[in-house]
């Protein structure tokens, strides 16, 4: 392995680690300034109806998330029951959202579960690729429209060649435009190195976009309802901030975007809200959107493995008695 290959291998993890440290430092500075007690008081002061609303949105959101695997199996012509594809979708997303390296962790969970139901390895690989593609297709579409229609202004100290996310939005939409032209058979698929554009029906592509759009709207709605007094900021204005923060968290590869996501949200929302209010809402959001589903999914996966182990033991003892 050459020196350049070694750098390419460790660079993403190193960048993610640096972003994590810097983000935690920024949050720690805010906590030191305002105090943990004030943040916890702000968390406890969130109206119960808002907490209930956020919890309801989380439940609906994770139901929507199961649609990725259901759509993947439909596209691949597999006849797995809805209960199984929904179980795979919930467990894989609830765990990968929190542990980070979503491509690796989510793929490993999908492989384990689908393999236990005798789904072939090539089909599993295609399902994994389809789910990951759906995520990015939806993100680029929703992000592109949001950044073009309601462009978020970027702080001057970043010294970027543009002052708003407008160019990012147009870039996102250009990529999606090419994708839809390919799936609509208006231009031929092409290859970039070993990668070839997938042959997905146009209707399925639209379903990918619709599914992911609902997913992102619901996920952002969880944090939005936890913020006090929405007269400060409209939902469309907040949505752009949420998307930008999530993209930063995804790029960092930090588990659940921990620290990176919060830092971006904190920085962009503090002109509208106090830091204590934002940190309190972020704490509630992480508990509701990440920790509760993570706990439920971990228990569900553990129960599944236990049942599988018992079933295999019964089958083994039955074959030996024969």
Curated annotation (Swiss-Prot):
Superkingdom of this protein's organism: Bacteria
Keywords: Cell membrane, Membrane, Transmembrane, Transmembrane helix
Signal peptide: none
Membrane topology of the entry: Multi-pass membrane protein
Chief localization: membrane
Transmembrane stretches, start-end: 7-27, 54-74, 87-107, 128-148, 162-182, 209-229, 249-269, 287-307
Subcellular location: Cell membrane
GO cellular component terms, A-Z: plasma membrane
Family that this chain belongs to: To E.coli YbhN.
Protein name: Uncharacterized protein slr0712
């Amino acid at each position: 392995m050459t020196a350049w290959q070694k750098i390419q291998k460790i660079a993403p993890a190193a960048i993610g680690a640096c972003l994590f440290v810097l983000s935690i430092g920024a949050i720690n500075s805010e906590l030191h300034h305002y105090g943990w007690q004030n943040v916890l008081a702000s968390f406890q002061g969130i109206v119960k109806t808002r907490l209930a609303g956020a919890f309801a949105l989380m439940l609906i959101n994770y139901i929507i998330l199961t649609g990725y695997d259901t759509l993947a199996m439909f596209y691949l012509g597999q006849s797995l029951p809805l209960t199984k594809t929904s179980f795979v979708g919930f467990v894989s997303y609830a765990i990968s959202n929190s542990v980070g390296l979503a491509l690796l962790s989510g793929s490993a969970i999908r492989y384990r579960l689908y393999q236990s139901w005798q789904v072939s390895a090539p089909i599993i690989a295609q399902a994994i690729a389809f789910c990951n593609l759906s995520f990015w297709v939806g993100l680029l579409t929703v992000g592109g429209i949001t950044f073009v229609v309601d462009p978020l202004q970027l702080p001057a100290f970043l010294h970027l060649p543009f002052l708003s996310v407008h160019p990012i939005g147009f870039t996102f939409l250009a990529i999606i435009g090419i994708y839809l032209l390919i799936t609509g058979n208006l231009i031929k698929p092409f290859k970039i190195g070993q990668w070839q554009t997938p042959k997905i029906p146009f209707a399925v592509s639209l379903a990918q976009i619709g599914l992911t759009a609902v997913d992102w709207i619901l996920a952002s709605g969880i944090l939005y309802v936890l913020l006090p007094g929405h007269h400060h900021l409209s939902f469309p204005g907040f949505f752009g901030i949420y998307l930008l923060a999530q993209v930063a968290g995804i790029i960092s590869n930090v588990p659940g975007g921990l620290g990176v996501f919060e830092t971006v949200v904190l920085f962009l929302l503090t002109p509208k809200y106090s830091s204590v209010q934002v940190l309190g809402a972020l704490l509630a959001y992480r508990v509701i959107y990440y920790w509760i589903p993570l706990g439920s999914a971990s228990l569900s996966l553990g129960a599944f493995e236990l049942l599988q182990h018992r079933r295999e033991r019964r089958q083994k003892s039955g074959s030996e008695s024969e």
